[in-house]
Amino acid sequence: EMSFVDQNDVMSALEEVLADAFGRMGVEMPTPLRRMDYWEAMDTYGSDKPDTRYGMHLVDLTDIFANSKFKVFATAANEEGSVVKAINAKGAGAWARAKIDKLAGVASTFGAKGLAWIAFREDGSINSPIVKFFSDEEMAALRERMDVEPGDLVMFAAGPRLLSDEILG
């Protein structure tokens, strides 16, 4: 029983109980557990219950595409409350178009009008229906910020911040 407590008091008490329970099973649990608020989770992972083991972070590219010839991105980049975000699926650059289209179908269930993507093939080639609209500077900035390597698949969402986070999460 606890009186006059806040969220941190409850979380700290539960951490102690969990650490003790795991300790009795021979598993050491480091404390304190990492804590993040809702907005940090959504902004970084696109989910309010992120699986942090994989390091697949959403990356904000809004500033890169503010003057893009790709109107979908330029519009979102210049609209209050909207963003251009992306996620790098490392090693997925060889996925077939059908598999990417299937992901676009899943994204549409979250309200996406589409799922923009760029596949960076192992042989150095690039496959994408949108890359023709990007300047060399935009591509260079994208590659750097997304830490793109041959074999990667970068997927984008553009529009209202929370919707874009949910689509990519």
Predicted regions and their residues:
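Class II aminoacyl-tRNA synthetase catalytic cores and aaRS-like
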Residues: E1-G169
